[in-house]
A protein has these predicted regions:
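Two-component/phosphorelay signaling modules centered on CheY-like receiver
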Residues: 10-28
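The feature encodes the CheY-like receiver
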Residues: 13, 55-56, 83, 245
Length: 443
């Protein structure tokens, strides 16, 4: 990572440059804003460490101009004259951190490493989105929330391997879409993607569906039939709701995954098969293993790489963009939701996740009385949830305050000094309110 240090004190520049260079970073230095702009315009700088109070342009002024040149650049502001108001100003301008001198180098290194991880995730998300632009996937994957950005980053890494993948997620979270994405980004993307909904297969037909049968293998087998494993040869096989596979058939599935060979029902010939398995479920697979409803050895065979998709209620930042996508997809005329309706949609918990949101938008478009969809046009359960969550004025204010505190703490990595500065309150007040609302870092 390329880091630019901007400080008018040569001793501070040299100290930071020497320390960071020893950690393996590519470090550039500037004594003032003009030097910083010259370097920034010619070098791919990813992090700028700025002194807040310098001769000429201040750190805030330099930061504002650098952000105008590249909004994606990360920045730390350092100062010997720290106070809440200056910290708030810098953070609002886009600084990631506000650090006081003398700088604790170990803390600085931790924060830089955290930024590195963020940059890697952002680059992988950008790469995935670029790939989706040229894909035939039916829906763009919305990932503004940190949770979904992590999902796309992990999926991108998984795609580069050949191991089996297990996707966990509630109904309607997009497990099928993620399976398609992993296949699309993999080396098998020019081969087939076979999707099997295990929940839709009658128990007595599972073996035939998965492995095929020979003519005359059983009553009604009038001709030879190739199963999904055979059809997926060379590509990816996606077994959705894999927990529905009968316990009696699981040993054969395990054997095929281990030996990469199988025979059709009624056949003697062993057929070689080369597939990448992606399995998914909305159930607690570990609990099923403990209850004896799913084989433990098969559990470990399919769970080499695991990916969990967060429910929509944990990625509310994505809801407005998802709504726009569904409006563009299903509406034949310009139409939008009122602010009140949009607020209700963002707050609703969505037990059916993205699929439920999609159906809500489809219904709203169908019954729209004009170009504006209002709260009264939404389903009763959403209006009821909005009404029951409004509460008294005091309850509303407390809910808003708690949400603001939690947002500031999460944005500041639970560093209380930075969170307090972001909110414009003292650390003592922040600690009091954290106790009041029982806010704790559980990660």
């Amino acid at each position: 990572m390329k880091i630019l240090i901007v400080d008018d004190e040569s001793s501070q520049r040299n100290l930071l440059k020497g320390f960071l260079a020893k950690q393996g970073y590519d470090v550039l230095t500037a004594a003032n804003g003009e030097e910083a702009f010259s370097i920034f315009s010619s070098a791919p700088v990813q992090l700028v460490i700025l002194d807040h109070r310098m001769h000429g342009m201040t750190g805030d002024e330099v930061l504002k101009r650098l952000k105008a040149l590249n909004p994606m650049v990360h920045a730390f502001i350092i100062t010997a004259y720290g106070n809440v108001s200056t910290a708030v100003t810098s953070l609002k301008l886009g600084a990631d951190e506000f650090l006081e001198k003398p700088i604790d180098l170990s803390v600085l290194l931790d924060k830089i490493q955290h930024i590195e991880q963020q940059i890697v995730i952002e680059e992988e998300v950008t790469s995935v989105n670029d790939a989706l632009q040229t894909s035939t996937l039916p829906l763009k994957i919305v990932a503004h929330s940190p949770g979904m950005k992590r999902v796309l980053s992990i999926a991108s890494k998984m795609a580069r391997s050949s191991w089996n993948v297990f996707i966990q997620g509630e109904t309607g979270t997009g497990k099928e879409l993620l399976a398609h994405l992993i296949h699309m980004l993999s080396s098998r993307n020019d081969s087939v993607f076979i999707e099997v909904n295990c929940a839709a297969i009658p128990e007595n037909l599972f073996e035939s569906e998965l492995f095929g049968h020979e003519k005359g293998a059983f009553t009604g087998a009038m001709s030879k039939r190739r199963g999904h494993f055979e059809l997926a040869h060379g590509g990816t096989l996606f077994l959705d709701e894999i927990t529905e596979i009968p316990l009696a058939l699981q040993p054969k599935l395990l054997r095929v995954l281990q030996e990469k060979r199988f025979s059709r029902i009624g056949g003697e010939k062993q057929l070689d098969v080369d597939i990448r398995l992606i399995a998914a479920t909305n159930r607690n697979l570990k609990k099923m293993v403990e209850d004896g409803k799913f084989r433990q050895d098969l559990y470990y065979r399919i769970k080499v790489l695991e990916l969990e998709i967060p429910p929509l209620r944990q990625r509310r930042e994505d809801i407005p963009e998802l709504i726009r996508l569904f409006l563009d997809r299903y509406s034949t005329q310009p139409i939008r939701f009122s602010l009140e309706a949009l607020d209700a949609l963002v707050k609703y918990p969505y037990p059916g996740n993205v699929r439920e949101l999609e159906h809500i938008v489809q219904r709203a478009i169908t019954f729209a009385r004009g170009q504006l969809i209002d709260l009264l046009d939404l389903p009763e359960e959403i209006r009821h949830h909005q009404a029951t969550t409004q509460g008294t004025l005091a309850e509303n204010l407390e809910a808003i305050e708690k949400e603001m505190l939690l947002d500031a703490l999460e944005k500041s990595n639970w560093v209380q000094t930075r969170a307090a500065a972001y909110l414009g309150i003292s650390e003592r007040v922040l600690r009091y309110k954290m106790r009041k609302y029982d806010l704790k870092n559980t990660s």
